[in-house]
From Swiss-Prot:
GO terms for molecular function: structural constituent of ribosome; translation regulator activity. Belongs to the universal ribosomal protein uL16 family. This is Large ribosomal subunit protein uL16. One of its GO terms (cellular component) is cytosolic large ribosomal subunit. It comes from Pongo abelii (Sumatran orangutan). Component of the large ribosomal subunit. Plays a role in the formation of actively translating ribosomes. May play a role in the embryonic brain development.
Length: 214
């Protein structure tokens, strides 16, 4: 018996049901890699960031997330080179879906009990996504804006429902606006730290502030 189509599990009807000591024997999620491309690129190398944003409250299967990841990665490698971008899948499939297997052979009515004891066995995992939640993000150089939009557009076809493509006003994967970012780094209010930044607040010991600005 094959996998049941994901359209059967598209809507968020039940409460979140994660893997636990009570919910055992869950098959591994299809998606294993959530970051692709040049993920160790410094924060100042990739200022542009594009998001794919969900427009529906639904469930996305781990198979769909994997298919979208492969699709976006393949296009970005072809158009920007394998070191010209960083893709991050922002959803993790933690919700376990169940199946109550039914026999379809002759004489099945003697072997099975129909809807008696119908709590199913774990079949796979899905990610629950809300309206306005980011599904996937890509950061790259400013000249690759059109390629980011096209990669996310192609990845959209792997998902049910509606999604929007949004070019962020923030710098890369940080939460700081792109037009203020370089000034804040120059003033040492932001310290680059891998693909993110550390924010140094105005509070704290004066000696620490003097040491930073000396």
């Amino acid at each position: 018996m094959g996998r049941r189509p994901a359209r059967c599990y598209r809507y968020c009807k039940n409460k979140p049901y994660p893997k636990s000591r009570f919910c055992r024997g869950v098959p591994d999620a299809k998606i294993r890699i959530f970051d692709l491309g040049r993920k160790k690129a410094k924060v100042d190398e990739f200022p542009l960031c594009g998001h794919m944003v969900s427009d529906e409250y639904e469930q996305l299967s781990s198979e769909a997330l994997e298919a979208a990841r492969i699709c976006a990665n393949k296009y970005m490698v072809k158009s920007c080179g394998k070191d010209g971008f960083h893709i991050r899948v922002r959803l993790h499939p933690f919700h376990v879906i169940r199946i109550n297997k039914m026999l379809s052979c002759a004489g099945a009515d003697r072997l099975q009990t129909g809807m008696r004891g119908a709590f199913g066995k774990p079949q796979g995992t899905v990610a629950r996504v809300h309206i306005g939640q980011v599904i996937m993000s890509i950061r790259t150089k400013l000249q690759n804006k059109e390629h980011v939009i096209e990669a996310l557009r192609r990845a959209k076809f792997k998902f049910p429902g509606r999604q929007k493509i949004h070019i962020s006003k923030k710098w890369g994967f940080t939460k700081f606006n792109a037009d203020e970012f370089e000034d804040m780094v120059a003033e040492k209010r932001l310290i680059p730290d891998g693909c993110g930044v550390k924010y140094t607040p105005n509070r704290g010991p004066l000696d620490k502030w003097r040491a930073l600005h000396s």
